[in-house]
Structures are given as C-alpha cells and as structure tokens.
C-alpha cells in the first residue's frame, strides 16, 4: 500500500468504527496487517497508528486482538529499519541513513512491547516536586499509564502529574495515608492488564484526572472483575441463611437454561417495604438460578 491507499483505508476504517460494523473493521485491519510495511515517517504522515492503537481496547475481542497484533507487527517493522528502503541512489550519505536509523530506534524504544516501557526507559524525569512521596507516586502513575501505550512520554507524564495534583487536593494537600492509599488504589487498577479501557480512557481524557480521583473501586474495576463481583453478589443472595421462607416447587416458571418447568422458589423482601418482594427461583433439573421482582 502507498500513502494514498493507506489514507483511503484509514477513512474507511474510521467510517466502519463509527458505524460499529465489526466485519468491515476486521476486513480492513486484515489488509493493513498484510499489506502495510510500517515506517516511522509513514505512521507520522498518515496517523494510522493512532486509529488502530485505539482499537486495542475495543469491546469486541477479535477487533482488540487484531489491533494488538498489527501494532506489534508495525513496531517490529520500525525496529528492523524498514523505513530505509535500499535504493541505489548513491547521493544518500551514510550519515543521513544513520540519523534516520537512530530516530527509528528511539521511536521503537518508546513504543516497545507491553510491560517494557517505564519512566526510566523513556528517560522521563519524575522528580518534579519537592516531595519524595509525590515523586514516587507520579512515577508509579506513569508506569501504569504507559502499559500497552504508544502515546508520547510528554502526554503520559502530564497525565501522571495531573492525577497527583487532583488526589493531593482531595487529601487537603497532605501526603498522608489518604493520599498514599488513593494513589496506590489508582495504580493497582490502572496497571491491571485486564483493564485496558481504563488506561485508554484516561489518556484520551474521556476520564479526566479530576473524575478519576473520585471514582469508586467498582467504577475503576475491569469488566471481568465487575462481572465476577456481580456473580458473587448473586450467589451470596441465594446462599444467604436466616429467616428464609420455605421453598415451594411449581410448574408456573420455565427455566431459561433447560426449558423445564420443575422450579423451586421462595420470596424475600430485599428492598423497602413498599417495594415488591423478590422471587428467587432454582431449577430442580439443571440447578440454574435466577431472580425477579
């Protein structure tokens, strides 16, 4: 693909993303993976890497996986020095080739694979305040935000400093336990490799540092963890002991799993007294459980 073809493919990809056409997105990315040999200059000129990079946190698993594969391949392309196509023009001086190769290598170091970028590898100074605790926390924020990211180090350190400032303000300007515990909680959630959406949302400013500093543990959690928590909550409801009415078996309810009508049930008041009671059902055939009110 030349630059014109790539721009055309990029426009089509953006349209497919906007229209949520998963099949088209995957088809276009397959072409990009097979036909594009990435160079630093090409990625800067077309800004294609930004579009594909954002898809790594796409809710569709296939789209996210393919986007990650493409980004990995393009990083390898740049690493191998493919921007230096071996033309026979003798006018190109060795020093120019060396300069371009050096720039490409620096770019690869900044865009290394998942888990390898840190503020140290990016040569970023995190000692930007007079407080050692704050500087350490800013470094932790940088290391968490940079996971799987191709964003510039200047953007990431700016975000890390903004997060520090917001958390510090909420802790009355003191780096005591409130500040440290909050920064530790944010670090643990941001560095979670199963939580790419949170990192991406912060870097895109979809979640501002101010908003991030006030988010609850449930809001910070990854989708997988939220599902696990919801499942656990449901299990706890069903296994709750105490003043629980006697179960009765009826054929009035149909199991959504096995379609049988041998269902035991009981009712409990789980909300306020003026709200309907919650009915807890369990299929006696397959063990499927559900509730409604």
Curated annotation (Swiss-Prot):
Which top-rank group of organisms is this from? Eukaryota
Q: Which InterPro entries match?
A: TF_IIS-typ, TFIIS/CRSP70_N_sub, TFIIS/LEDGF_dom_sf, TFIIS_cen_dom, TFIIS_cen_dom_sf, TFIIS_N, TFSII, Znf_TFIIS
**What are the recorded GO MF terms, alphabetically?**
DNA binding; transcription elongation factor activity; zinc ion binding
Keywords annotated in UniProt: DNA-binding, Metal-binding, Nucleus, Transcription, Transcription regulation, Zinc, Zinc-finger
GO-annotated cellular components: cytoplasm; nucleus
Gene Ontology process terms (BP): regulation of transcription by RNA polymerase II; transcription elongation by RNA polymerase II
Q: Known Pfam families for this protein?
A: Med26, TFIIS_M, Zn_ribbon_TFIIS
- The annotated region (Disordered) lies at 81-123
Where's it mainly located?
A: nucleus
TFIIS central domain location: 133-248
Q: Provide the TFIIS N-terminal domain boundaries.
A: 4-81
- Where in the cell is the protein located? Nucleus
Which residue stretches are annotated zinc finger (TFIIS-type)? 251-291
What are the Low complexity biased-composition ranges? 100-116
Q: Which residues are noted in the entry as Zn(2+)-binding?
A: 255, 258, 283, 286
* Disulfide bond entries: none
Family named by the database record: Belongs to the TFS-II family.
Sum up the protein's function in the record's words: Necessary for efficient RNA polymerase II transcription elongation past template-encoded arresting sites. The arresting sites in DNA have the property of trapping a certain fraction of elongating RNA polymerases that pass through, resulting in locked ternary complexes. Cleavage of the nascent transcript by S-II allows the resumption of elongation from the new 3'-terminus.
Q: What is this protein called?
A: Transcription elongation factor S-II
């Amino acid at each position: 693909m030349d630059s014109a073809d790539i721009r055309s493919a990029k426009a089509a990809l953006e349209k497919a993303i906007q229209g949520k056409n998963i099949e088209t997105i995957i088809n276009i990315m397959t072409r990009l993976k097979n036909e594009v040999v990435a160079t630093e200059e090409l990625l800067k000129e077309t800004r294609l890497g930004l579009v594909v990079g954002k898809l790594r946190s796409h809710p569709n698993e296939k789209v996210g996986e393919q986007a990650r594969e493409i980004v990995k391949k393009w990083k390898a392309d740049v690493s191998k020095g493919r921007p230096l196509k071996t033309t026979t023009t003798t006018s190109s001086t060795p020093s120019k080739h060396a300069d371009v190769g050096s720039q490409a290598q620096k770019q690869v170091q900044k865009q290394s694979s998942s888990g390898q970028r840190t503020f140290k590898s990016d040569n970023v100074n995190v000692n930007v305040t007079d407080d050692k605790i704050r500087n350490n926390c800013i470094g932790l924020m940088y290391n968490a935000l940079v996971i799987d990211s191709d964003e510039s180090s200047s953007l990431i350190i700016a975000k890390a400093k903004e997060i520090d400032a917001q958390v510090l303000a909420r802790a009355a300007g003191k780096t005591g336990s409130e500040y440290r515990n909050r920064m530790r909680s944010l670090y643990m959630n941001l560095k979670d490799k199963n939580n790419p959406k949170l990192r991406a949302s912060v870097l895109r400013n979809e979640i501002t540092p101010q908003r991030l500093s006030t988010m609850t543990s449930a809001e910070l959690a990854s989708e997988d963890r939220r599902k696990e928590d919801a499942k656990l909550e449901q299990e706890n409801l069903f296994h709750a002991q105490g003043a629980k009415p006697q179960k009765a078996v009826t054929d009035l309810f149909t199991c959504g799993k096995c379609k049988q009508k041998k269902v035991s049930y009981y009712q409990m008041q789980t909300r306020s007294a003026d709200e309907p009671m919650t009915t807890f059902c369990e299929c006696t055939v397959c063990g499927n459980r559900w509730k409604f009110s």
